[in-house]
Amino acid sequence: MSAASESKYSTEVLSELLSKLQVADNKDEAASNISTFLNSSIVEHDVPVEFFEDLKKQIQSKDAKVSLAALDAYKHIASTNGLSPSVEPYVVDLVSEVAVKAGDKNKDVQTAASDALLAIASAITPTAVKAILPKLIDNLTNTNKWTEKVAILRAVSQLVDTAKAQIALRMPELIPVLSESMWDTKKEVKEAATATMTKSTETIDNKDIEKFIPQLISCIAKPTEVPETVHLLGATTFVSEVTMATLSIMAPLLSRGLAERDTAIKRKAAVIVDNMCKLVEDPQIVAPFMDKLLPGLKNNFANMADPEAREVTQRALNTLRRVGAVGENDSIPEVSTAGDIDVTLNEFNKLVADKKIAKRFDVALNYIAAIAGDLVDEREIQPEAWLQNVLPFATIFLHEKEAKEIIEEFRKRAIDNIPQPPSFEDEEDEGEDLCNCEFSLAYGAKILLNKTQFRLKRNRRYGLCGPNGAGKSTLMRAIANGQVEGFPTQDECKTVYVEHDIDGTHADTTVVEFVIEDGEVGLTKDVVVDKLREFNFSDEMINMPIQSLSGGWKMKLALARAVLKNADILLLDEPTNHLDTVNVAWLVNYLNTCGITSIIVSHDSGFLDNVTQYIIHYEGFKLRKYKGNLSEFVKKCPSAQSYYELGASDLEFRFPEPGFLEGVKTKQKAIVKVSNMSFQYPGTSKPQIQDINFQCSLSSRIAVIGPNGAGKSTLINVLTGELLPTTGEVYVHENCRIAYIKQHAFAHIDNHLDKTPSEYIQWRFQTGEDRETMDRASRQINEEDEQNMNKIFKIEGTPRRIAGIHARRKFKNSYEYEISWMLGENIGMKNERWVPMMSVDNTWLPRGELMETHAKLVAEVDMKEALASGQFRPLTRKEIEEHCAMLGLDAELVSHSRIRGLSGGQKVKLVLAACTWQRPHLIVLDEPTNYLDRDSLGALSKALKAFEGGIVIITHSAEFTKDLTEEVWAVLDGRMTPSGHNWVQGQGSGPRIEKKDDEEEDKFDAMGNKIAAAKKKKKLSSAELRKKKKERMKKKKELGDAYVSSDEEF
């Protein structure tokens, strides 16, 4: 039998079976016969178009029996296992007609239509969702019949099970329709829509919002729940990749949250937008939601009064614009049409134009276009996937061989239309791979890296660059602790993290024992000693306790231990911290010649230039690799210029202006003076520093330089009162406030890691004094002080001892102090006793009489007076946030993040902010370049230049100090040689410092209440006084007895 005859025969059989269906006693059996014949006995390249046209007419029939039988046949066809590709497109094409029947008046027809919809939703090819879903959505939107709506909603729920991944991509068009159905007046529709919405959220693969999905669905139906839901999500840590499905369920909440009246809700909605959008990888993911989110953020930024909330909104706007690739004038990029059925159909029709495809195959062509559109939306580019999904339907009208060729060309053309997210090829060369993996990394409440590639080769030196808080140190520690997914284990690749500060628990351990005791080294003492000598350790140093080593030598010791572990990869976090220039040069030479792969985090641009072969840079939660050293990297990435030049930083720091110092009329006058000072630690053979002379003023810009162990930090500790000099004199102006940031800056905050920065500052200054300075040696009363304080004074003929010093007032060119007394009785006898006297017996003594015996008590009073002269600052959240913002910490970190979760650089900024809270006159920085990134270093450099007080800096970074300091203190072997100084006696020359009344800041009491200061009257000249007198006399003459004078007339 010929193909034409067979086709005619098939059509006749189907017509006969369909006509029998109407009169059959067992309709299920008759429908099953049709299904069996359709799915197995049709001739290849033939489609029973006439049968489906007849079936469509019967489904639409107003006769319930006819329609019921046709729907039963439709259900059986769809329910057959292995629905034939030549039948499936035509079955799906009738979905709209079947859905309409679900709203029929006849209950049996309604049920049959509903069951038929479920059957086709279960049987459809998953990638053909774009062929069926638009039809269902169209029916759902346009019908008024609630039974039809319920049937369609149940079918959509079934589609989620059939094609979960594909429905996830359709969520942007599905969620608005489901939301509208949830507001339907019919209870059954509301319930079905809520159930379908819940079912559709199964496509959302995002663990961050999983537990909030019930609340997200609920607030769609009940807008009053939006504020509470925003609050819940505002405290969420977002670390999972954000997909189109995730944004589909979040966008309705966020757009409503941005439109709420309450500023706090608007702010939190902006925070959520900011945090979620950072995890979007492709602009096309966020494109469908831009018209909802962007206008809301812009409107809030323009109209909100709260500056902090506006700042948060601005940050969210910047993130959304960057992620969404928003153009100039906020032109929103169009959503890609590469996956539209019209586009893919047009491409396919071009490819088969010469094949003369018959009209009856149009339905199949549209079906292929829908499948191709889904593959494009899924970013599927593999040829196997295209063949598997498209070939069964293309062979309806093409031979298999030519179909494969056409599909491959179709695939190439389709994927060329897909907009590609930014991607970068690593600049690599040949060599042995030590690591090649993909991973994500989060720290606390922050995503650091999201599905990034990481590849390392043997004998390469990599510099790891990124801003503070990007996660450089966290990545290094994660690698060392085996927490990076896919990174080789220690057995496969020995990775050693070189600590920049050895744990204090080893303080008394000798250098050689420290290395030998490490279980991973496993070497004899002789081998360890030889290696330490290779690292320039002398025999004396090898047997010294670790606490006696300077910071630089501790770094060399940690490096020596790492090398002895036979490391394949060295992880070096700020290796040049505490190293002088000689040791930095040694380290450069060692890393360049040792043959060990190293990953280096450093803020020393010169060091990175001399060592690195590749730069690994943090870019949008990815790691991108650039070949070449830092200078080569900056050429390729100009935005990273601040890594190379401190002055190129756009970040700005500001220090508060120091308060007025009584008696200091020029910036040259000494506020700190040290004469013939020396210091020696107890138990040591010689002084650590000796014969030290210097002075500091408000104009001082001093760099303290010298090799490791020369005594620089000891000198500074004496200057700031941390240590008391063994001999010599240290004068500090009575009202002078000194801010001291230690070499190990984290020492200030180590015991407060579970506080927020705001809480830490409130704790530190809650009494008005700086609680961090209370343990300084200059404030501790020792036995010698107690003996001196037993001195007996003869006051008004009675023997007295000082009980306390309470207040200070001006006395000639100095001060005198209010003293409370104890009265002596029976002095020198066994029953000697000292009785506290009443406050009315208090007297005043000059400073000179007290300094010899009660210097520390006098200093306490001076400090309180100094604080009072700076005025109390209100310890309110707003004041603290504004102060911290001057040092580069935003309000989110200051008030809403624990110190434990801050990066190293952010912690240093916090220490800077806390130490300068009391508006110091002198800022002393010990190694400020440690831990701060290049941007922050540039900002710090500019802030120090603009600071109105004095600056003393210990640093090995010539780059940092070269344009900043004028005076140099060179410390070598315990002696200090100053140069470039301009020390003066008395006030010196230069412009006078005037305390201007009109420039005084607002004053506050300790509770934060503003004190209204009375304005001082301006002194009038004699001419002005005469004029006032004439005006008074004139008024008196005019008014007579009714005249009453006022203060303003005098």
UniProtKB/Swiss-Prot annotation:
It is found in: Cytoplasm. This is Elongation factor 3. It catalyses: ATP + H2O = ADP + phosphate + H(+). GO terms for molecular function: ATP binding; ATP hydrolysis activity; GTPase activity; RNA binding; translation elongation factor activity. Residues 980-1050 are annotated as: Disordered. One of its GO terms (biological process) is translational elongation. Has antigenic properties. Ribosome-dependent ATPase that functions in cytoplasmic translation elongation. Required for the ATP-dependent release of deacylated tRNA from the ribosomal E-site during protein biosynthesis. Stimulates the eEF1A-dependent binding of aminoacyl-tRNA to the ribosomal A-site, which has reduced affinity for tRNA as long as the E-site is occupied. Assists translation termination by stimulating the release of nascent protein from the ribosome by release factors. Residues 1013-1037 have a biased composition (Basic residues). Its EC number is 3.6.4.-. Its main location: cytoplasm. Monomer. ADP binds at residues 43, 45, 86, 395, 399-400, 708, 927, 930, 956. PANTHER family: ATP-BINDING TRANSPORT PROTEIN-RELATED, ELONGATION FACTOR 3A-RELATED.
